C-alpha cells in the first residue's frame, strides 16, 4: 500500500526561486519540483535547445510555484513553520517573495514519484552541455558533454537562468590549462561542468554540509576525478589561486566576496558571477570596478544578470 506524503507548494516570484529552494533544503525535504514562468518563456523562445519539454508547464503564469515533498512524520509541522517564517524574511535581503503563500496537500507515494520526476528532462544548457537527470535516457551527440545530476538533492539543476548563464560562460572561458574555483557550489553542477569542459583542476566550496554531500554524490555519477569539494568558506579552506572563479549566489554575498576574490584569482583571471537580479547589477559592477576588475561581459536572461570580469 502506498505511504502518505505531504506536498508543500510555495507560490513565489521567479526572482526568489533560488532563495526559496535553499530554504526548502534546510528542511528534511525528499524532492523539489520548480514550475517557473520565466523558464517557460525562455523555452518558447528557444525551442531548438530542448530535447524534451513537459507541455504541462505551459500552464504556469507569472512567477513560480515550487513544490516540495516530505514524509508524513512528527517533524513536518515544524518544517512548514520554518518555511513560512523564512519566506516572510526574504524581503529583508532585498528579495521579492511574490505572493509568498504556502499550501499543503497530502499525496501518496506513487503520486509523489510521478509529480516530482516529470519536471526534469534532459536539458541542453549551452553549446555543448546537456544536463540529464539520472533516471532519464539520453544519447549525446558527438560534440555534447552530458552531466548526470540528481535533482532530488540538488541546489542547481541547470534550468534556472543563473545556472544556465554561468555554464555558458564556462564554455567560453575554460580550457585544458584552467584551474577553476566554484564558490557556493550547491549541487556541484558548475564544478562538474568545468571538469567536463576539460579544466585542469576544479575546486568547489560550500558552507552547507548538505550541499557538499550532494555535490560529492553528483561527482560520482559523472566519473570525473579532477574535482575536490570542500566544506567551509573561501577565506578559510581554499589555498592557491585559480584562472577562473565562478559564484552563482546572490548580489549581497557577491559584493562581500569581491574584495577578497583578487587574493584567489591569478593575474588575467576571470570572475564569473550570477544570482544577480537586474536591479542590483550596477551595484555589483561598480564594486568590481572599484576593486580593479575590468568588465568583460554583462549577460541577462529573464530578470537575472551574469557578469564576467577580468582581473
Swiss-Prot record:
One Pfam family hit: PrmA
Residues bound to S-adenosyl-L-methionine: 163, 184, 206, 248
Chief place where the protein resides: cytoplasm
E.C. number(s) listed in UniProt: 2.1.1.-
GO molecular function, one term: protein-lysine N-methyltransferase activity
Catalytic activity line of the entry: L-lysyl-[protein] + 3 S-adenosyl-L-methionine = N(6),N(6),N(6)-trimethyl-L-lysyl-[protein] + 3 S-adenosyl-L-homocysteine + 3 H(+)
Compartments (UniProt record): Cytoplasm
GO CC field: cytoplasm
Top class in the EC scheme: transferase
Keyword set, alphabetical order: Cytoplasm, Methyltransferase, S-adenosyl-L-methionine, Stress response, Transferase
The keyword Mitochondrion is assigned to this record: no
Signal peptide annotation: none
Biological process (GO), any one: methylation
InterPro entries cross-referenced by the UniProt entry: Ribosomal_L11_MeTrfase_PrmA, Ribosomal_PrmA_MeTrfase, SAM-dependent_MTases_sf
Induction data: By heat shock.
Function: Methylates ribosomal protein L11.
Family of this protein: Belongs to the methyltransferase superfamily. PrmA family.
Name of the protein in its database record: Ribosomal protein L11 methyltransferase
